[in-house]
């Protein structure tokens, strides 16, 4: 039997996910955040214009001098001018700056006047307050009317008392009673007159009777003598 030599092939190692992750982390370089040595150009421009206080407006050259004197902008003058021009144009477009004369970045610049909020809101709030106060006054007026109505109702009830109703009734009764007294007086007056007229007739009769009686007595007494 002849022996056959078998050649062994080396095992190939497959890369794992962990090895890929470590390689990726090794290749990435952390970025260092560069802190700006100065604020944005528009902020520096507004500061320069407010401090320069030029009636006609501050020129780009005056603004550039103020910025470079206060902040460290580096030695690249052309780059600084380019940033300054673009910031001036953006300031005019955004109405932060007003260009008094010139075109583009050339000329003079002033700060835009801050627009006051419309007074309509204040007027509206004032109207609301007035409406509230008027409503309160109206409510209080209604309450006052109710109280006055109650008071007047009480007064009317007091006025309609039985005493005042009884007084005119008494007056009417007295007037009616007075009328018959007058008629009675008129009726009694002729009766009294008739009685007075009838009285002398009786007196005359009595006189006649007295005259006749002594004549009869004289006739009876004559034979006795």
From Swiss-Prot:
One of its Pfam families is: Linker_histone
Give an example GO molecular function. Answer: nucleosomal DNA binding
A GO BP entry: chromosome condensation
The family database entries (Gene3D superfamilies) matched by this protein are listed as: Winged helix-like DNA-binding domain superfamily/Winged helix DNA-binding domain
Which residues fall in a compositionally biased region of kind Basic and acidic residues?
Answer: 145-156
Q: Where in the cell is it found?
A: Nucleus; Chromosome
UniProt entry keywords in alphabetical sequence: Acetylation, Chromosome, DNA-binding, Nucleus
Q: Which SUPFAM superfamilies match?
A: Winged helix' DNA-binding domain
> Residues bearing N-acetylserine?
2
Instruction: Give GO cellular component annotations, separated by semicolons.
Output: nucleosome; nucleus
For this chain, the family text in UniProt reads: Belongs to the histone H1/H5 family.
Q: What is this protein called?
A: Histone H1.5
């Amino acid at each position: 039997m002849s022996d056959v030599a078998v050649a062994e092939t080396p095992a190939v190692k497959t890369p794992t996910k962990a090895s890929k992750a470590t390689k990726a982390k090794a290749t990435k370089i952390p970025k260092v955040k560069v802190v700006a040595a100065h604020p944005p150009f528009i902020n520096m421009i507004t500061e320069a214009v407010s401090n320069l206080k030029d009636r006609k407006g501050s020129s780009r050259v005056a603004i550039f001098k103020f910025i470079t004197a206060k902040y460290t902008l580096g030695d690249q003058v052309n780059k600084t001018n380019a940033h300054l021009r673009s910031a001036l144009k953006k300031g005019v477009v955004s109405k932060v700056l007003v260009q008094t004369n010139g075109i583009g970045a050339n000329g003079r610049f002033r700060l835009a006047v801050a627009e006051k909020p419309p007074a309509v809101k204040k007027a509206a709030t004032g109207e609301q307050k007035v409406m509230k106060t008027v409503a309160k006054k109206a409510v209080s007026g209604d309450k006052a009317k109710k109280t006055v109505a109650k008071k007047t109702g009480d007064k009317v009830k007091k006025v309609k008392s039985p005493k005042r109703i009884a007084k005119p009734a008494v007056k009417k009764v007295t007037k009616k009673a007075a009328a018959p007294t007058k008629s009675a007086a008129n009726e009694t007056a002729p009766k009294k007159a008739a009685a007075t007229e009838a009285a002398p007739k009786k007196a005359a009769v009595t006189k006649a009777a007295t005259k006749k009686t002594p004549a009869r007595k004289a006739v009876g007494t004559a034979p006795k003598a």
